[in-house]
């Protein structure tokens, strides 16, 4: 396993602009605070640039789209591209919605630092066969061999972008590196918003100067390792959700948490 540099303690309390959905915004805000940064969530086109200009990273999540939000997303993404602001785009629901898929493809022109999605979403986006329903990945879409080759090709077209593909095994692909990471637990599927949270944590690590590849590996591993520490048989949904946020604030105190990352990194 490649030696990643511990991002903690956070050097500066960065402002993370999350253009996300109403369902998971509270979890994302608390997750960002738990790592030592500050969240803001503005998706009104009349003010979106005011907040984006003050931010150190931008997270765009398509989980609850509207015409007004799309307008604001395009404005923020354009600014991020022009000002070299790190940007994460989470392609939620592109397996089902042609509007969302079209928007994500347009956002590629703004050169996001990280493009995130589950296995079905990313397969759909790059033109591979998929079985995703709604915003959920299908167990039939977990084969990575064909996807990996296509993503390597896409990284030649978008050399500054990394792909973060979540699943039972998380796949992170950049122009020069590939990671297959294996931390996590099925209990994370019990509660909504954990996938969105990975994107927000990626933005946090980008705000600290990490590359798209490093930030993606750190974010998905951090959440998964935090969850592994609290898996208790018989725990109810609300208690598990509470403990996830609790562990996000505690794990950063462990100087050796990086040693528990499972998986491989290839050059």
Curated annotation (Swiss-Prot):
Its EC number is 2.7.1.50. CDD domains: THZ_kinase. Pathway: Cofactor biosynthesis; thiamine diphosphate biosynthesis; 4-methyl-5-(2-phosphoethyl)-thiazole from 5-(2-hydroxyethyl)-4-methylthiazole: step 1/1. One of its GO terms (molecular function) is ATP binding. The keyword Kinase applies. Keywords: ATP-binding, Kinase, Magnesium, Metal-binding, Nucleotide-binding, Thiamine biosynthesis, Transferase. One of its GO terms (biological process) is thiamine diphosphate biosynthetic process. ATP binds at residues 116, 166. It comes from the Bacteria. It catalyses: 5-(2-hydroxyethyl)-4-methylthiazole + ATP = 4-methyl-5-(2-phosphooxyethyl)-thiazole + ADP + H(+). Pfam families: HK. Its cofactor is Mg(2+). Substrate binds at residues 41, 193. Belongs to the Thz kinase family. Catalyzes the phosphorylation of the hydroxyl group of 4-methyl-5-beta-hydroxyethylthiazole (THZ). This is Hydroxyethylthiazole kinase 2. It comes from Streptococcus pneumoniae (strain Hungary19A-6). The gene is thiM2.
């Amino acid at each position: 396993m490649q030696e990643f540099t511990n991002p903690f303690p956070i050097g500066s309390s960065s402002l993370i602009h999350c253009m996300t959905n109403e369902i998971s915004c509270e979890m994302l805000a608390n997750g960002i605070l738990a790592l030592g940064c500050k969240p803001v969530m503005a998706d009104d086109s009349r003010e979106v640039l005011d907040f984006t200009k003050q931010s150190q990273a931008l997270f765009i999540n398509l989980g609850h789209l509207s015409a007004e939000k799309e307008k604001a997303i395009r404005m923020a993404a354009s600014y991020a591209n022009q000002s070299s602001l790190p940007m994460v785009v989470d392609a939620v629901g592109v397996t089902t919605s042609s509007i969302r898929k079209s928007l994500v493809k347009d956002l590629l022109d703004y050169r996001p630092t990280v493009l995130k999605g589950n296995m079905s979403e990313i397969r759909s986006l790059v033109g591979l066969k998929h079985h995703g329903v709604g915003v959920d990945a299908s167990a039939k879409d977990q084969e990575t061999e064909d996807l990996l080759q296509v993503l390597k090709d896409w990284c030649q077209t978008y050399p500054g972008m990394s792909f973060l593909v979540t699943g039972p095994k998380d796949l992170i692909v950049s122009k020069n590196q590939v990671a297959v990471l294996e931390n996590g637990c099925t209990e994370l599927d019990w509660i909504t918003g954990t996938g969105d949270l990975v994107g927000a944590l990626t933005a946090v690590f980008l705000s600290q100067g990490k590359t798209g590849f490093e930030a993606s590996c750190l974010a998905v591993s951090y959440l998964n390792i935090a969850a592994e520490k609290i898996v208790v048989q018989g725990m109810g949904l609300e208690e598990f959700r509470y403990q996830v946020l609790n562990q996000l604030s505690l794990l950063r105190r462990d100087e050796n948490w990086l040693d528990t990352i499972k998986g491989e990194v290839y050059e």
